[in-house]
Amino acid sequence: MIYFVRIWLSNGDNLHDKVFHFKKNFPEDATEQEIDEYFQDTYQNLYNAFFSIYEPPKDGGNYCGWKYISQSEYEMLI
């Protein structure tokens, strides 16, 4: 099963925004939890790296996240 994900990171200043798109093939017997955990771990690693370089949002907001996207959306964006 192939999954597509967008991860976005921002500290709210619109100068250092980063967006990543991933395509990952999982075994047919992979559970939803395993897939979610894989992408959550990927997101968390990128989040930690991003905020080791850039200051966190001054307003305390959260401008980061991740979501599943369709194959057509992925292909349009890469």
Model region roles, listed by residue range:
Residues I2-D29:
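N-terminal acidic leader/helix
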Residues I2-F4, H16, E32, F50, ...:
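Low-complexity, intrinsically disordered short peptide segments enriched in small/polar/basic residues
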Residues D29-I35:
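Short, conserved charged micro-motifs
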Residues E37-I78:
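Short, mixed-charge low-complexity intrinsically disordered segments
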